[in-house]
Regions:
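Short alpha-helical donor nucleotide-sugar binding micro-motif in glycosyltransferases
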Residues: 306-312
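Conserved donor-binding/catalytic core segment of Leloir-type glycosyltransferases
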Residues: 72, 224-244, 250-254, 266-268
Length: 369
């Protein structure tokens, strides 16, 4: 009787959870007076409570051998963010290696554009495979399990493969991390952070990266000057304005080149500025008086992003911390000289012999950063 009642509670909870997520846009005006950070914290608190009370279970090694030998990738295959590209690169490796796989699109709370449909034919709602590979952070994994229940993971070998950008893990992640049989770490920096907090195997698994030189784009397409040496930086406001540090790029550019020097320019490409009006306004104010700086806050196709990288001359990332640094790596693959902070995930591939590394001094992460 207790089991039947518990299953009923779970089923009812999942129904209302999915209903709330499906109609989230309806509730946004009502929640407008509550800032984004407070809403996010409340949402995660509710999820964590439900996860611990109803769904948490340590992984065992009893597997359903009637399942297909293959892998189900879980994450954001359509999203125009680093996590989306990370999953897509993994899927391309499986394709080239003839590995049987499918993709489950989990767009819980997705606030970024979902315009990359390159893997749409591999999307499926069921899960016939023995192995799950989660391109989801532990808090996102909690939302996934609460939304779909334990059936998606039961009897399967569950691997976590996510990006994290700081040297320590959030304490709230420790419980859901224990759900995985093993964890893959795409950089030594992430491996070091994970290994300090968990007993599960933390395996260094660098991502496969490739980028095709996008043809058909020139500077006129992006309304950029033809006769200047252009430095380039790209970021998502949602990925932490302070961590990505575009203001550092602006300051460094203006200190390095006098305002009368018209032989150089800086291109800043972002998405999500409308969701972070304070940071958006701060950046606009910093560049307002400098006509050499082009600021583009818009959704581009994957081809346009590569095209924009291609027509610029050098990539600059004065980040405070990166889990991997996908944009840095993509620029290097395009043959662009890179200037980057000599710290965090990117030092796996940015070295003193192939990049211009910038010295740094570690500071405490401030509240709200």
């Amino acid at each position: 009787m207790r089991k039947v009642l518990l299953d009923l509670i779970k089923k009812t909870g999942r129904y209302f959870f999915k209903l709330a997520m499906k109609n989230y846009v309806i509730f946004k005006p009502v929640l407008g007076f509550v800032n984004l950070e407070t809403r996010s914290r409340f949402k995660m608190w509710v999820l964590r409570l439900a996860f611990k009370a109803l769904y948490f279970r340590k992984p065992n090694f009893i597997f359903d051998m009637n399942l297909e030998k293959g892998i189900t990738l879980v994450g954001y295959p359509y999203a125009a963010i680093g996590e989306g590209e990370f999953l897509r690169q993994t899927a391309r490796v499986f394709l080239k290696s003839n590995i049987n796989f499918g993709i489950h699109n989990f767009n819980f709370g997705m606030q970024s554009s979902e315009n990359n449909k390159s893997l749409a034919s591999f999307i499926r709602s069921d899960n016939p495979h023995l192995i799950n590979l989660f391109h989801l952070k532990p808090d996102q994994f909690e939302a996934f399990v609460v939304s779909l229940g334990n059936s998606f993971v039961k009897g399967r070998y569950n691997i976590g493969y996510w990006v994290w950008e700081l040297g320590d893990l959030p304490e709230a992640w420790i419980s859901p991390i224990k759900y995985f049989h093993e964890i893959w770490c795409p950089s030594r920096f992430i491996q070091s952070a994970v290994s300090k907090f968990v007993a599960e195997p933390a395996i260094y698994m660098p991502p496969a990266l490739e980028v095709e030189d996008s043809k058909g784009f020139d500077r006129s397409y992006f309304k950029l000057p033809k006769d200047r040496f252009l430095f380039f930086f790209i970021f998502d406001f949602k990925s932490s304005f302070f961590r990505k540090n575009p203001m550092g790029c602006v300051r460094a550019f203006q200190e390095a080149f006098h305002k009368s020097d018209k032989s150089v320019g800086l291109v800043l490409k972002s998405i999500g500025g409308d969701q972070y009006p304070n940071e958006f306004s701060k950046l606009n104010e910093a560049i307002r008086a400098d006509s050499r700086i082009n600021f583009i806050d818009a959704i581009y196709s994957p081809e346009e992003i590569v095209g924009l990288m291609s027509v610029c001359d050098s990539f600059v990332s004065l980040h405070r911390s990166e889990g991997i640094g996908l944009s840095i790596a993509q620029s290097m693959l395009l043959g662009k000289p890179v200037i980057a902070t000599g710290y965090s995930g990117n030092i796996d591939f940015t070295r003193s012999d192939n990049s211009c590394l910038v010295d740094y001094k570690l500071i405490e992460v401030g509240e709200g950063e």
